[in-house]
């Protein structure tokens, strides 16, 4: 599972955790999130997220 970070506000989407409060179950891959989904913290689109490595 990977993690994706919003380059605008720093919000992190963790594929392992999903976002149940947004209707995205745990284990949902980034590719499977709808294209019109937006960052829950700042409202930017998926284009403004980058995959990150957390050490």
Swiss-Prot record:
SUPFAM superfamilies: Rubredoxin-like
This protein's record includes keyword Ubl conjugation: no
InterPro entries given in the database record: Rubredoxin (IPR024922), Rubredoxin-like_dom (IPR024934), Rubredoxin_dom (IPR024935), Rubredoxin_ET (IPR050526), Rubredoxin_Fe_BS (IPR018527)
Protein residues bound to Fe cation: 6, 9, 39, 42
Superkingdom classification of source: Bacteria
GO biological process, one term: alkane catabolic process
Domain Rubredoxin-like per the UniProt entry, residue ranges: 1-54
CDD domains: rubredoxin
PANTHER family per record: RUBREDOXIN, RUBREDOXIN-1-RELATED
Function statement: Involved in the hydrocarbon hydroxylating system, which transfers electrons from NADH to rubredoxin reductase and then through rubredoxin to alkane 1 monooxygenase.
Name of protein: Rubredoxin-2
Lineage: Bacteria, Pseudomonadati, Pseudomonadota, Gammaproteobacteria, Pseudomonadales
